[in-house]
Amino acid sequence: DNIDVPTATRKGILVMNTPGGNTLSAAEHTMALILAMSRNVVPACNSLKGGIWEKKKYMGNQLNNKVLGIIGLGRIGMAVARMAKGFNMNIMGYDPLAAPPDAEKIGVRICKDLDEIFKQSDYISVHVPKNEQTLNMIGAEQIKVMKPSVRLINCARGGIINEDALYEALAARRIAGAALDVFPKEPPEDKRFTIFENCIVTPHLGASTEEAQVEVAVEAAQILVDAIKGGPVRNALNAPSTMGAAPAIVTQYAELARRIGAMLSTIAPGQIQKVQVRYRGSIAEMPVESVSLGFLIGLLQKHFEMPLNMVNTSVLAKERGISIDETKNAEVKDVASSFSARVVTDKVTRTVTGSVFGGTRLRIIEIDGFNIEVTPQGSVIVIFNDDKPGVIGSVGTVCGRYNINICTMGVGQKPAEQKAMLAVSLDKEPDEKAVDELGKLDFVNEIYVCKLN
């Protein structure tokens, strides 16, 4: 938010951040808001300052034995869980990526989906980055299934809780309260939440403690010292995507793997349970650490606000209990080299295979057993469909109607199963109307838009 990263990159200036320094401060602020809501601290304080003694009006609630639902079990979410256990709260947790191994050890009950949290929680606190998956994660439909006694807390990013839906719920007394430390636009032009006694608003104070600022400064200084001494460049926002002087073909495969990871992060929704990669052909005889890391970067990036790189990705993956099962086979004859990745989630299992042709041309050559060939660049629409005539023409017609140019198209079939798929590389990102229209075609079973660059 404070540095023009693209300009710094153009000038050759390395930019680094310190994501861990404010973890405790953000978690403590979350607990402060939970406590303040539960005991009506803010309205009671304002009332007494106004000369009114209203002890009965501001009777509160205990945290003891209440259910706290935490959405996002990263560093801050886990810190909140540990603190809340000190108040004897029952913790339910859900993470869109994967629950960290330590979560259950500290007493967090891992939920399979968000509905469990929405229906059973007395308090719901969000600790996820803002992205396409989490924007408006909590809206009117989600609030409808919550307890009337629920209280919502957002110390993460504005927009994760839909503000219109939250306002309507507070106005109708559909929920017991809310606490907001973040807003879609800061400072917020909209002051409507200030009218509710049961809604606490603070000006993005999550990381605003003296101790957090010292921690951030110390971490920044240590990162700088390490970099100057030639050590690993930690938390770099604009570092090169590969490390060391790898062979050119390895660099190409690292980029291919990143794009395959990005594709799988879209077509394999759900919490990650298992990750496997396979190297075949001559690439299996080369140093491929950067390729596996490139794959993880693509797979995990949308779940983190900080840019992932070759230094921080393995650490962040380990924190979430994600590891790669890697196999190599140099003795193959069907293709010179290939990289294949398989991701198992709680909802689906997907496999994508790619190869580098001519040393520079990145290609996807197989998706879930469908043999195809498509260039993994820009936006790629992946469609799983019934195998019937007219599919290609119908897809092309819809794209043409929305002035979308098809760059490459891969088509795969499984005649015995009467199933097929298309992978369509586009010259621009399709708008929602085009995707909706494609999804309504009678032969389409699943459709995904993968952003690979």
Predicted regions and their residues:
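A conserved regulatory-domain signal marking ACT and ACT-like small-molecule sensing domains
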Residues: S241-M243, P247-N453
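Rossmann-like dinucleotide-binding domain for NAD(H)/NADP(H)
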Residues: V15-M16, P101, S149-A268, F304-E305, ...
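Glycine-rich adenosine-cofactor-binding loop
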Residues: P19, N64-K85, Y253-I260, I383-I392
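Short beta->alpha connector loops at strand-helix junctions that form conserved
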Residues: G12-L24, D95, L114, A156, ...
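An N-terminal-biased, well-structured beta-alpha scaffold segment characteristic
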Residues: D1-V15, K119, G139, V275
